[in-house]
Every structure is written in C-alpha cells, then in structure tokens.
C-alpha cells in the first residue's frame, strides 16, 4: 500500500507515476473523499472543544447551584452529532482504504517507462545456446517417453495439470533439493516449510487481494454464516513474507533471509489460449522461493544479491539465460523494481521467464504493518523482497530441452547427479513386446 501522506502532499505527481504503470488514479474521487474527511474531522474537533467548554461550564454552574439542564441537553446533542460523525468518518476511511488497496506500487526512478514486455530492457546474457546436429524436440516430445504424463494429469484434474513418473519425477525432485541446498548452504537463507492454505488477510498483506482474487484458488468450509474462506497459495512468497506481519523486529536481526520449496496454485484466469501445450503454464507447479526482509537503505543491494542467487542456479545447471529489467507497464502489482531471468528454450528458439526478483520497498510492509527498530530505537517499516530461485517445473523443461540427445535420452546435468544417485542419463524405459 502506498503512503497516504504521499498522496495528500503530491496527488498529481503520484497520479502521473501510477499512469506510467498503466493505472488511472481517480483523482476526483480521492480528492472528494479527502475533502469530506477533513470537513468531518474539523467539525469533530470543533464539537470536542465545545463539549469540553460546556463540561467546565456545567461544573462551575453546579458549584453555584444553578440549573444545568439546558447546557446538559446541548452536551447530549453534541454527543449524538459526534457519534454520527464518527460513523461517517469510519465509512470514509473504509472507502479510502479500498481505493488505496487497489493502487499498485510506484516504480523506482531507475525503472524504464513502458507499456508492456516489448519495452523491457535486457541487462546481460550468460552462456551460449547449444548448437544441435539433429532436429530439436520440445519438452513434451522429449519428456513424454521418459515419464511426462499429460494424459493422466488431465484425467485426474483437467487441463494444465501434469503427472510425472519414474526418473522424470526424480529429476524434478532433484532440482528442488539442489536449489534449496544451494540457497541455504551457499547463499545464507533459512529453509522454511510453510502452510499451503492461508487466510484472506494474509493475501491482502502481500498484495494478491483484493485485485487478483480471480487468479487464486479459494477453499471454503462450513456453511452459511459459519463459512470459513481460505486460499491456496500462488507462491510461498505469501507465507514467507507474512511471517513478519504485525511485528517489530530488532534492527540487528536484519536481514531476514528465508527460502521454501512449495507447490503453487494459480487459476491462470487471464491466460486462456496461452502456452496450452506442456508444462510452461500450469494450475499447479513447484517453486523454490527466496524472500528477504531488510532495512530500507539495504533493499536495492539485496535485490542485486537476490538476482545473483537465482543466476547461480542457472549457471550451475549450465543453462543459458538473460536478465531483463521490467518496464513500468510489465511489473507486478506490488513491485517497485523487478528483474526477470529468462532461460533459453531451444525448441522455441527464444528465452522464457524462469525467475522474477522484485523489491517491493515498503509497499507490502505497510499493508502488513511489518516494522523494525531503527538506530534511534523508533519503529520503521521494513522493505521486503521476493524472488524465484527457481520455478522447478520450468527448470525441468529447460533441462529436458537443452540436454536432450539424438537417441531420445536426456543427459543429467553434473550438478544434479549427486541427487540422482550418480545417474548420468535418463533413457526411455524398455518397451515390453
């Protein structure tokens, strides 16, 4: 959530910066609510002052034995008006809060202004795409004989679900374990196991609600007035970041660095017809997430560090990739700045997103009331960052395509062999005649 004081000081400036993100701030609606709020607060202060004055007057009158009934009646009327004003003020505050909850974060000044992904800026590349001396297959054609089972996944749960079998399932697990081990043993993150189902207020904290309710899978139990609504997490960023919700941590405890491997659930409501083949876009997928909670003056150094941690996974796996800076129109709702890592997929002859690393600055912290005690001993909002380290399913896709062989087998990357019992190659199971 943005700082409402910023809007009160520079409403037109905020509106312009939000317009760079493709968001139209209803300046008239905000101004009208603010004017009404100020008027009610001013009137309430006047009523409070009048009531205090009358209370003193009543005390003096009683001391003289004078009749106070008229003054008492006026005090009662003031009390009634103040109650009505408080109710009206509460209504206005709710409407202001609803308006604020729908506003995206303001982009950092270093973010390129643009409309969509066409305006993103490439930062660097690593690795050279492999040259094949045979016809390259996509991950579906490579993986299906080896244990990718789209048919059974669809039979069990519908479109955009996949079953993994045998060595492919083991490779998928190996990738997640390798990522977690790298982040915990080499990058300083603390491994965390989180709930996969969370309460609605947790999603408000990280920014998925109220705007993206249609992208979430909702779980309801009970019935009628006793219905309890919860949501499946779309990323473990949600659970990890909210661990500092409604708390004040000591400055000496920062940075807090957490990582988790979890399934993620997304309805993909706005992606009809996109990436319908294979594992690129699924309703259920695994991801290893990185989260950092840091002091404000350290957050952009932490962002660069987090990008480096995601890059390290790709480099250890020998997968070519590029890093891009997302433009204002392509960033996620809560982000102030985002770097995407895109891995090379030879069958598509292009780079595809495999990690997104974002600094949300104080945007999530303000929604969560997550603070730290600064050097002066005063509570101050933390900055929160999140990044994929990496999306496990898409990494599996990249391994299958980049390490495929002419005979249909897949070479196991060296970094994964300790997690695969020393296996160097995945071959299709022998067919029984």
Swiss-Prot record:
Example GO biological process: seryl-tRNA aminoacylation
Residues holding L-serine: 235-237, 289, 388
Assigned keywords, A-Z: Aminoacyl-tRNA synthetase, ATP-binding, Cytoplasm, Ligase, Nucleotide-binding, Protein biosynthesis
Reactions mediated catalytically: tRNA(Ser) + L-serine + ATP = L-seryl-tRNA(Ser) + AMP + diphosphate + H(+); tRNA(Sec) + L-serine + ATP = L-seryl-tRNA(Sec) + AMP + diphosphate + H(+)
One Gene Ontology molecular-function label: serine-tRNA ligase activity
UniProt cross-references to InterPro entries, sorted A to Z: aa-tRNA-synt_IIb, aa-tRNA-synth_II, aa-tRNA-synth_II/BPL/LPL, Ser-tRNA-ligase_type_1, Ser-tRNA-synth_1_N, SerRS_1_N_sf, SerRS_core, tRNA-bd_arm
Subcellular locations according to the entry: Cytoplasm
EC number: 6.1.1.11
Biochemical pathway: Aminoacyl-tRNA biosynthesis; selenocysteinyl-tRNA(Sec) biosynthesis; L-seryl-tRNA(Sec) from L-serine and tRNA(Sec): step 1/1
Domain of life: Bacteria
Any Pfam family: tRNA-synt_2b
UniProt cross-references to NCBIfam families, sorted A to Z: serS
Function in brief: Catalyzes the attachment of serine to tRNA(Ser). Is also able to aminoacylate tRNA(Sec) with serine, to form the misacylated tRNA L-seryl-tRNA(Sec), which will be further converted into selenocysteinyl-tRNA(Sec).
Domain writeup: Consists of two distinct domains, a catalytic core and a N-terminal extension that is involved in tRNA binding.
PANTHER family named in the record: SERINE--TRNA LIGASE, SERYL-TRNA SYNTHETASE
Official protein name in the record: Serine--tRNA ligase
Source organism: Burkholderia ambifaria (strain MC40-6)
């Amino acid at each position: 959530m943005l700082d409402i004081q910023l809007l009160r000081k520079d409403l037109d400036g905020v509106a312009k910066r939000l317009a760079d993100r493709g968001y139209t701030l209803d300046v008239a609606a905000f101004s009208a609510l603010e004017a009404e709020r100020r008027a009610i607060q001013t009137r309430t202060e006047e009523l409070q002052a009048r009531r205090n004055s009358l209370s003193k007057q009543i005390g003096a009158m009683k001391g003289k034995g004078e009749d106070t009934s008229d003054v008492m009646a006026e005090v009662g009327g003031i009390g009634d008006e103040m109650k009505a004003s408080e109710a009206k003020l509460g209504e206005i505050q709710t409407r202001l809060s609803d308006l604020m909850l729908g506003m995206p974060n303001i982009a950092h000044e270093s973010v390129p202004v643009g409309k969509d992904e066409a305006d993103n800026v490439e930062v660097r590349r690593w690795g050279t795409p492999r040259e094949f001396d045979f016809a390259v297959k996509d991950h579906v054609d490579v993986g299906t004989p080896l244990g990718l089972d789209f048919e059974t996944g669809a039979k069990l749960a519908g479109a955009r679900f996949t079953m993994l079998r045998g060595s492919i399932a083991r490779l998928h697990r190996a990738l997640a374990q390798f990522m977690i081990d790298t982040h915990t043993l080499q990058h300083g993150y603390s491994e965390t196991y989180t709930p996969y189902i969370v309460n609605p207020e947790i999603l408000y904290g990280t920014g998925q609600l109220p705007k993206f309710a249609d992208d979430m899978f909702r779980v309801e139990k009970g019935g009628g007035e006793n219905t309890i609504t919860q949501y499946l997490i779309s990323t473990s960023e949600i659970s990890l970041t909210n661990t500092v919700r409604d708390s004040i941590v000591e400055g000496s405890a920062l940075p807090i660095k957490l990582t988790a491997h979890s399934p993620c659930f997304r309805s993909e409501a706005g992606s009809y017809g996109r990436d319908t083949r294979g594992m690129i876009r699924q309703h259920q997928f695994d991801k290893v997430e990185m989260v950092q909670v840091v002091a404000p003056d350290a957050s952009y150094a932490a962002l660069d560090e987090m990008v480096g941690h995601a890059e390290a996974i790709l480099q250890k796996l020998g997968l070519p990739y590029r890093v891009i800076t997302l433009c204002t129109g392509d960033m996620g709702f809560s982000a102030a700045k985002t770097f995407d890592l895109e891995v090379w997929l030879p069958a598509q002859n292009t780079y595809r997103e495999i990690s997104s690393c974002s600094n949300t600055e104080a945007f999530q912290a303000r929604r969560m009331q997550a603070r730290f005690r600064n050097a002066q001993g005063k509570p101050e909002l933390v900055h929160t960052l999140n990044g994929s380290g990496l999306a496990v399913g898409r990494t599996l896709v990249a391994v299958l395509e980049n390490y495929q062989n002419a005979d249909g087998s897949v070479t196991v990357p060296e970094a994964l062999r300790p997690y695969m019992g020393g296996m160097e190659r995945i071959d299709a199971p022998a067919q029984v005649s």
